[in-house]
Design a protein with these regions (language model features):
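GHKL/Histidine-kinase-like ATPase module
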Residues: 72, 87, 107-214
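GHKL-type ATPase core
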Residues: 2-112
């Protein structure tokens, strides 16, 4: 987690206070010259992580670090990589809603809208493949497929399996689409399955999970 933080941040500060403790501690580092831990102040229990985002480098092709301050970018990253973490990840999200109509509004009144912020849960928390097959309907399989892969058609086949061994256990949910991807016969096609560990996306296209002859 700290390594990923320093990919976009020039300085990381962690303020933590254990439940039942009167003392908080502050961990700080710039990612280059070690770190410091000192007593600090925190009114409530828990942990706050504060990132100082790097300034954008010059150049047209340079990375833009301030995009990680944008709501849609952060929420998209959470849904992509941490959608199945087993605790809620919440964020203040903007929503547009109509203002109350005035009592003396004219007949041709056009509604006015305002932006409000609500604390939304971004992740679904429970992956479908960890549930027992007997508790899942085909409609639920199909709905998950459509939402996950942005395909309006139902899959041609759904394969859901669970395996336990001495050294490893896994759940697998495979979908065979009704039609081949548009880029299937092009050089740009990337094969592979999505690989998750403890609910976190490790690889989006892991080619080694499924051999070509399958």
């Amino acid at each position: 987690g700290f390594y990923a933080s320093f990919m976009v941040a020039s300085h990381v500060k962690v303020v933590s206070k254990a439940c039942g403790s009167d003392q908080a501690y502050v961990w700080e580092s710039d990612g280059a010259d070690g770190f410091t831990i000192e007593p600090g102040e925190k009114e409530t229990y828990g942990t706050d992580i504060i990132l100082t985002i790097k300034p954008n480098p010059e150049g047209e092709d340079a990375e833009s670090y301030d995009e990680f301050l944008q709501t849609y970018r952060l929420s998209g990253l959470v849904r992509k990589y941490s959608d199945y973490i087993r605790y809620p990840i919440k964020m203040l999200m903007p929503h547009s809603q109509a203002k109350p109509k005035p009592e003396d509004a004219p007949e041709d009144y056009q509604p006015e809208y305002e932006t409000i912020y609500t604390e939304d849960t971004l992740n679904s928390m429970v992956p479908l493949w960890t549930k027992d097959k007997k508790d899942i309907t085909q409609d639920e399989y199909d709905e998950f497929y459509r939402n996950k892969f942005m395909d309006y058609m139902k899959p041609a086949r759904t394969i859901h399996s669970h395996s336990e061994g001495l050294t490893a256990s896994y759940d697998a949910l495979l979908y065979i689409p009704s039609q081949a991807p548009y880029d299937y016969y092009s050089k740009d096609f990337a094969k592979g399955l999505s690989l998750y560990t403890s609910g976190v996306l490790i690889m989006d296209k892991c080619a080694d999970l499924l051999p070509d002859y399958f």
